[in-house]
Amino acid sequence: SKKFQTLALGATLALTTAFTAPAMAGKDFIKKDLSADLPLSKKKVLITAGPTYEPIDPVRFISNPSSGKMGFAIAEAARDAGAQVTLISGPVHLPTPDRVKRIDVISALDMHQASMDALNQTDIFIATAAVADFRVENSHNQKIKKQDNSGPGMTLTLVENPDIVAAVAQHEPKPFTVGFAAETRDVENYARQKIERKNLDMIVANDVSRQDIGFNSDQNAVTVIWKTGLQAMETASKAQIARDLVTLISAHYKKAR
């Protein structure tokens, strides 16, 4: 009868609600519980990546071959470790990782400003960007023509860019600060000098003169140095190096706090 069908339907809906709601609640509980166990859960991580362009005129600039691949890989690894990640990127040809906030910049001055603006409540700062040390003092608003020069050559006056990672390390409260040292010789020695001079917690050094792990390579090999020790990471994909770095950084961050 219609009355029986109505009662049966009501009972079915009641049973469905009774069993579905707790089941879904259980899934949410498990998801939250797993998230809480991640090493960087609820931590804010700020990462710089890629090169910077220092303009000479509207069509020429000073830069370097950095691809940004290492920084983007670290952003993904930090996100997977539970962090809230902000990625400040120079000009690169890479897609934005899912669930990562990306801020695009061009010059070293842009990156410095963006880093200081985003630094509030940052727990960990990782400076992978290959920032140009110098910029042209007076860049031209119009393209420079050959005939504009009175002689056979042209002289550019360069001025020093702000040291972003050193500025971050001086900030109060200071985030756990990780620098990168891309060197072509005496890699470990130069890295140790930087960690002291810039008051860093850790530094990641690599030899960019090697063709197999250079700027645009998909692989890397690094030595991670801190004030009381070091750890070498042999050649592997940048994704794997990134995961290993995030594991090591999170462990040292917890010890420091």
Residue ranges, per PLM feature:
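Phosphate-binding loop/pocket of nucleotide- and phosphate-handling active sites
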Residues: G229-R257
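Bacterial N-terminal signal peptides that target proteins for export
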Residues: S1-A8
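Glycine-rich phosphate/diphosphate-binding loop of Rossmann-like nucleotide-binding domains
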Residues: D37-S107, L119
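Glycine-rich phosphate/dinucleotide-binding loop and adjoining beta-alpha-beta core of small-molecule
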Residues: K27, R79, Q84-G214, A232, ...
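Internal gly/pro-rich beta-alpha loop/helix module
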Residues: K27-L34
